[in-house]
Amino acid sequence: MTDLKKAAQRAIELMDLTTLNDDDTDQKVIDLCHKAVTPAGNTAAICIYPRFIPIARKTLDELGAEDIQIATVTNFPHGNDDIAIAVLETRAAVAYGADEVDVVFPYRALMEGNESVGYELVKACKEACGDVLLKVIIESGVLADPALIRRASELSIDAGADFIKTSTGKVPVNATLEAAEIMLTVISEKNTKVGFKPAGGVRDAAQAAEFLGVAERILGADWVSPRTFRFGASSLLNSLLHTLELADAPKPTQGY
């Protein structure tokens, strides 16, 4: 297997296959669940709006794909600074049955010099999550300044984040290697049990390999696993299956 194919295979196993569109429907989420069961193995998770969690759970169970985690989003996409609303949304996501919650850090407040609201929001949402994994989206493409990307990462980890994530995918600049370098460095300094999720803008196996390479250089090859590294993506999967020459392959038979 070529290095590019190896990267494609790994990226599928590390993927949060995502649909977060205003026109999402039950059927689109059902289709996403089916796509997550690929000829190259299952993706790590799907990421959907909270209201679709029950239909996603039912579909994944029917597919015999209970190992695929269900992630959802809160305080999304604008990263408002109302802690009470973020906590209510997070509690609701957990009640719907989410395995993982991706919450947006109040990044605009940080840009205005307010560090405390971000820390307190993440801390409160982690308490609301309990054992549910909390990923914190810092919106690195809007923060832009390396010092702000670093500070948002530090505050999120200090407040209890299980993962730090680059982007919502709803702004012009999403995951970049420069942001990955900063965020992974903060993880190496603070807590190597915290995971990293580049989201948006990773289009093919070559780009996926670049992000994996940065993670391995900073934290070691053994660090990268679904517990510590995810790709947030919607269109990436098709490209990876083409790289693996599996785009038209039959799906594995699972479930009924």
Swiss-Prot record:
GO terms for biological process: 2-deoxyribose 1-phosphate catabolic process; carbohydrate catabolic process; deoxyribonucleotide catabolic process. Its EC number is 4.1.2.4. It catalyses: 2-deoxy-D-ribose 5-phosphate = D-glyceraldehyde 3-phosphate + acetaldehyde. The active site is at residues 102, 165, 197. The keyword Zinc-finger does not apply. The keyword Lipid metabolism does not apply. It comes from the Bacteria. Catalyzes a reversible aldol reaction between acetaldehyde and D-glyceraldehyde 3-phosphate to generate 2-deoxy-D-ribose 5-phosphate. PANTHER family: DEOXYRIBOSE-PHOSPHATE ALDOLASE. This is Deoxyribose-phosphate aldolase. It comes from Shewanella sp. (strain ANA-3).
